[in-house]
Amino acid sequence: MEEKQNAVLGTAPLGKLMVKFALPCTISLLVGALYNIVDQIFIGWGVGYLGNGATNVVFPLTVLALGLAVMIGDGACSYVSICFGKGQAENANRAVGSAVTLSVLVGVVVAALYGVFQTPILGMFGATEANFAYAKEYFTYITIGIPIYVFGQAINPIIRSDGSPQFAMLSMLAGAIANCILDPIAIFVLHWGVMGAAAATVAGQVITAAMGVCYLCHTRALRLGKDDFKLRGKILAAYLPLGLCSFLAQISLVIAMAATNNMLVQYGAGSKYGADIPLTVLGIVMKVFQIIISITIGMSAGCIPIVGYNYGAEKLDRCRGILWRLMGAEALLGVIALLIMQLFPLQLISLFGAESALYNEFAVITFRVYLCMLPLATVNKAAFIFMQALGKPAESAGLSFFREVLLAVPLVILLPKAFGLMGVLYSMPAADIITFIASGLVLLRADRQLRK
């Protein structure tokens, strides 16, 4: 952004400004969520529910890589926006350059660890005897693409902070379209099974990352030189804490999913559904939930540059206006999503293949119980991100850690002891209710501070 374009963040009507930035961000993240949905749909019809169960085992490992990427990208995005608000262009350039370097290094390290410890990792995340071969095959090819994936996901929010949310959206969209085209070809024409689904996903990630590289060569406000790509401790310390909430949100989700998968296998094995049906079904339900959360995060993260600029420029009344407009929109999203989950669960699960009556029975129960507190979940997630945008990583990360680790993990372990397999399903709404109380208190305190 140039100075005049930056000024728009501090003067334009909030409603229009929020839509302008949030819509492309939302579409970008929604497209990212569709990567997994598309894989699940084609694998469900081409391989069967064991194939879907295998991808559900691998999914948390992709989320872990995403967590590292968004810690770098979202942190840099928040910091760059604040720097623009303060007129500190040099620090903004150095933050972006170091984020590029760090994302590449992190991606390579994660891929190496995944490759070396593949078998124990899959066992840790709930692979069963029936789906292990599928999981190993899928994970092998996903691992190859991890460095590209981390880089592409880290660059996307940085592109938004440079005033190009539309390009950020298009780069994600291009990768998703490629994935959608290649998936059926790889699975149904070439008969590559889960390997084909993984290869199509990686191909889409390559396209997204390549577009990110092209953008870095033609940035708007950022002027990157070779010196900016050095890793400087002072710059890293300035922006990585701002992305800590995003990282903890993802890493906490990974921990929760690992615990959930293992509880599903343990208590499912003693139920009429067996171990593999609950593991597969809840994984699919979580992918659908990720669509809702992607919209939630997109609406909130799209506002980060606006909040960051106005907070840096000390226009606190505008920050407060964004706060309550955002929370209202997120609550409405949650209500609409809840109605869909309650009214059309069978139609939703049918998208992922034709399975037995027992499978469908558990799917309907899971949609209706596990996601029954969606309006609270969307507001909670928005609260985490808003505090991050204000440059308050402690409150942001604290709420996220409280929800995903201190609540979700103990609940998913303890509730099944009293309610069996259903206890696993009760754990999510219970965690959302308690977190909503904490989020409300934090937001009210932020509102009071913004009034001063």
Residues covered by each model-derived region:
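Short alpha-helical transmembrane segments in multi-pass integral membrane proteins
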Residues: 1-22, 80-147, 189-244, 307-373, ...
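N-terminal transmembrane alpha-helices
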Residues: 9-46, 60-75, 79, 104-111, ...
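Transmembrane helical elements of multi-pass membrane transporters/channels
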Residues: 20-39, 141, 152, 175, ...
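Helix-terminus/linker motif at the lipid-water interface of multi-pass membrane proteins
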Residues: 34-52, 122-129, 185-192, 254-284, ...
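Small-residue hotspots at the loop-to-helix junctions and early N-terminal turns
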Residues: 47-60, 135, 139, 198, ...
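Small-residue-rich hydrophobic transmembrane alpha-helices
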Residues: 52-112, 149-168, 279-345, 378-399
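Hydrophobic transmembrane alpha-helices of multi-pass small-molecule transporters
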Residues: 64, 179-183, 209-213, 291, ...
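Short runs within selected transmembrane alpha-helices of multi-pass transporters and secretion channels
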Residues: 73, 142-160, 168-179, 197-210, ...
